Each structure stands twice: as C-alpha cells, then as structure tokens.
C-alpha cells in the first residue's frame, strides 16, 4: 500500500537534506499520507485520564455545556468504564452490550447512560473509507467504542482508546459550543502549568513587556536552569481531516495556525532576549540570558502523527522561510482565507529568520530553528513519569535532539537513548 501511494520506502537519511523549496509541502504531504495509512494516535491511558479530567475541569470552571443529556462527569464515568473493561494487553476488547450498559447505568444513571451510548457508540465506522482522500469524512480517530455483531461492543485497544475518546468528546462539544477549541487551548496552558508545579518543577508563565511598557506577548511556560532558558508555547490546534485527506493548502493553513504560529511567538521573545540580554516581565522581574543556552519548544495537545523527527521539523521550517503560496485559479472563499492565514504566518517567520541571522556572527552555522523542539503532550507526560525537576526534564527533551535514528518516534528514540546512557554509566 505504501508503494502504491509513493510514500515508501523512507530512507533513514532522507530528511537530513532539505527538500527543494518549491517542493516543501509535497514532502510534508508524503509524511502526512504515510501517517494516515499506517499510524493511529496513541497515549498511555493514565496520561489521558488525567488530561481529560484536568483539562475539562478547567474548561468548565466558568460555565457548562448542557443540552446533550449528559454532563462532563458522566463522560468521565464512561471513560472509566471503558478503561475497566479494556484488555490489559494492546488488543481490542469485545464485551456484551448488556454488561457495559449495566456498569455505566450504575455509575451515571439510566438516562445519562442512554445519552452517552447514543453520542459515543459508532455503528458503522469508516463505511465510506476506501482511499486516503476519504479521510475528510472518516471517523477513524474517534473510534473508542463501536457496535459489533453478536450483541457486543468493540472497545479500542488501550493505547488508542484515550486519543479516540478525547477526539470524540471534543467533536461532540464542538457541535454545541463554537468556541470550545479556544477554551480548550486556554485550559491547556493553565493545566500544564499547574501539572508541572504539582510535581515540584520550578516553572512559571510570563507576560513580556515591550520597549514602551506595553504587553509584547506571553510565554506559556518558562523553565530555567543554570545553563538553559527554555521557552514553551502550548498549542491546541492539530491537523484537520482535510489535511489527513491530502489537501496541501489545508496542511499549510493547519501548520500556520498551530506550529508555525507557535514558533513565531517564541522567536519574537528569543530575538529580544538575545538582542537586549534580558526580557522585562509584567510582574516587575527580568529574565536575563547571562550566557545561557536558549531552547524553543512547541507542545501540541493534538497528535500530529507518529512519523516526524527533528530533521523533518527543521527541514520543514527552513523550507518555509523560502516559500510563498500562490493562489490557484479555482479557490473558494474559505480556501482564499486559508491561503492568507498561511502566507501571513510565513511572512512573519521569514522576517524573524532574517532578524535572528543579523544577531549572529558572520561565520555562525546555526539558524532560528537549530534550537527548536516539537512534541505532543503525550510524550511530555511520558517524561514526567520519571523527571521531577526542570534540569532532568530539559535533559530528557534535549538528549539526541540533533540525531537522526530513522525511527521517527519520540518514544522509541527516548527509550533507545536512555538505554545507551545507562549502559555507559
């Protein structure tokens, strides 16, 4: 199948070398298509349970979404029932419908049970999915529980259950609240900061002041050590179904609204920090560089797919600083708006890349993207299982970030590099 769609073989060295500037999106679409064919978002159920509970508790502090026959606490009850019934091995589970409904009704009541089943159970998932371009209308990523034959339900394997449940939950809320994605994004920032503080990791959120004392943006998460200043930007937006279906323009728009925008926000602060040696913060303190290394890290709430690595990321960003998207003859209004969003983000990225280069010596062999990391929150939560200080967390994030192993999987690479480090010690 990979050969049929020309996304294989992937040489482990392929992404060391930047693609031609005019073919940057084409190269990225091959990665997206490979992911669509062969990867499914996955996460440790423990991470996902904490994320679902904490994130939506933050979202609903101000108000609640009503009208669907169940409350958020009921959805958490369904999640816990599914998790209790799912096989401990990484395989799917079949369970009698009566058994699941009984457990759920005991937890949330009969009325909420019926409403939840109507909302979350898929009867014929992907019935119209034949080729990757059909992903635009597919529900692959929402398949947590499916109606099966023989009076049974199918429950997704534990590694995939969390992301599927989360995607379905967000999709259901989006039908009732058009601003839910913005609310989730704000809650994600607050939740991640609170999570690290609970673990004892020294960190803070910072509001940066410009030269005239006005707000110049914020840093969602700031970690400092004696050797490193790490600036984090947290983003909710991931890749949309249109991108998964092979729409190159939508890919550019998705990246512009998520990753590229995050890099632009962090780059602005990094440039000011390197130029002035410090950032003035709204709380009256100053963030001083003092010769330390600067790291930029964009953390995504969404899973962008499994098969990207640091080389793909850096080559992508470097191709973007030499790219402008041109309108085709048959763009509709929505596509034209997406094109404008993408080009604005690219223009900002290009100007900041030039400004950054002016701060460096003539012989410098680094650019704006050499210190850039990009991970989803599932991987960060994985690291937080063992890392409880800013120093150890940053060490884990940075180890091997300049290496290309060919795995294109942060979890695999982290395990391999950890094993190698332990052997040496």
Regions found by a protein language model. Give the residues of each.
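Extended, hydrophobic alpha-helical segments in both membrane/secreted and soluble proteins
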Residues: 192, 217-221, 232
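Active-site metal-binding core of divalent-cation-utilizing nuclease and nuclease-like domains
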Residues: 205-219, 223-226
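Catalytic cores of nucleic-acid endonucleases
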Residues: 236-297
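Active-site beta-strand-loop-beta-strand hairpin of nuclease catalytic cores
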Residues: 223-231, 235-241
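Flexible loop/turn segments at secondary-structure boundaries
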Residues: 211-217, 238-241, 304-307
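Acidic, metal-dependent phosphodiester-chemistry machinery of nucleic-acid enzymes
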Residues: 1-186, 190-202, 212, 275-425
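Residues that form or immediately flank small-molecule/cofactor binding pockets and catalytic motifs
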Residues: 208, 236, 301
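Short helix/loop capping segments that flank catalytic or ligand/cofactor-binding pockets
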Residues: 164, 232, 240-242, 307-308
